[in-house]
């Protein structure tokens, strides 16, 4: 078991230095339209017991903040949600919920974790390594190895909880965490069922949007620019980050506007969800292809949920084509990509519950 979080860190300032796009890709470039620099230390918050989520607390669920360490030695911070009046004389199914790229556990993944706890599951929503309240330095980077490992670390943690049946642990990944969850389940058979929502394949988003791989010369040019930036940073220059812009312009594309409406408005904004990611991490996604071996998850089940109108729907369609049975693609009528982050009247809660009830049964 982990411990209650009792750590404080300095707050840092974030400074925008322009809105030009570094990446020329329709998807990842649109979702990360600003270039930013950050001061030396990441922003953290001390846990005081005050509710700090973008959604209301449930009277049917007990919440506490926990910490545990992944295989890479990174301290992960998670919110744990447990149904009230849980029968502790028996063990229960559990779920690990991963947040979207650039998000934090106080947003979408926390909403999913709390809502599934209302439906009888023990759940955790963690901050990915190098993000939110979790450890890892420097902050605001994304490593495929680390974020995949974070899911397995969640299985480690839940499997030691006396209330949890370690043979009945499932995973929900939203947006980029959907791709990470599929990759994690391929190599960790302890994850007995996997559901994704509005899934993104970050390797495809950054380097092969809709299957159209970046031209070799453009790819080489971008890698060279990132290499030069690494030398600059090693010599003391400010780090460069991609993030959503702080304001919209008439030229802002539709995908960026969709993300902006969540991350940059009271709807979903959170002080630790900067959306910023250090550009030096992008080359690590060049060979990240979570669908190539998705059939390895079988005979464990996969449920892929996508909005009918989601710009990301094709990722789920690509994955379902390569997955082996049992598998299901569930399309939410009238929903877009970000709609399934927080619009509780559109999120198919009953579908998620029935899926995990069936496949995490005793």
Range-by-range predicted roles:
Residues 1-21:
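N-terminal secretory signal peptides
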Residues 49-90:
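N-terminal cap/lid segment of alpha/beta-hydrolase-fold proteins
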Residues 102-114:
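The serine-hydrolase catalytic nucleophile loop
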Residues 117-133:
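Conserved alpha/beta-hydrolase
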Residues 142-161:
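Alpha/beta-hydrolase active-site loop
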Residues 182-262:
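Alpha/beta-hydrolase-fold enzymes
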Residues 304-306:
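Short beta-strand/loop motif that positions the catalytic acidic residue
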Residues 335-345:
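Catalytic histidine-centered segment of alpha/beta-hydrolase-like enzymes
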